[in-house]
Amino acid sequence: SPEGEMVLIGGGAFAPGLGVRHENMFGLSTWAPDGQVEIEIIAESEGEASVQGSVGIGEVTNPDLDLEVNFQEFQAMDRRDVSARLSGDLTIQGPYIRPVVSGDLFVDEGTLFVEEFQRAVDVVDLLASVDTTQIDLSSVLESSNRFLENVRMENTTLTVQRNSWIRSARMNVELDGQLDVLWDRQTQELALVGELEALRGSYGALGRQFQVDGGTLRFLGTS
């Protein structure tokens, strides 16, 4: 088994599926004879993200992951359908081909474009019950990477903070609130439970434009 250290200084990478470039990357990996690799990675994209933990390479094509991820106002996505700057902490555990992600995330700033994201949502006076089983996630992460294709998200809380918007041809609304998230990329199952408060914005209906100064989006999860 390999033994020793590998260091990356001043690296960069572009993630086409996320639409962001990571810069000023630093990485340190320490390889032990028993097949355990201790890693530390830091990357910048507006804010900063760091990864620490261990990777077991007993099975090279399916290493075992035990990682902690921290975001500090990190530009995690910048796509045509969704843009998000995140803070918070996640853990990534389990085999590479079926990892489990859990933790607490905060959306410091974000925008979701409804038509692009293909949401089947009927909003009436900004009071809605959303069936999250109807959300098409196929465009979020287009990749043949087995990690991304099979990732599961459990016991995860998403806190949406001010300066987070949902936008469509009829709607432009700032949101605030908290959701519990359960997502299985492999089966395309998504459950969101919680409420988002509409803080301000506008909504068009029947040929008229209405100003929004309150209301609630309720997410009820899967049936």
Per-region residue spans from a language model:
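Strand-loop-strand
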Residues: 4-223
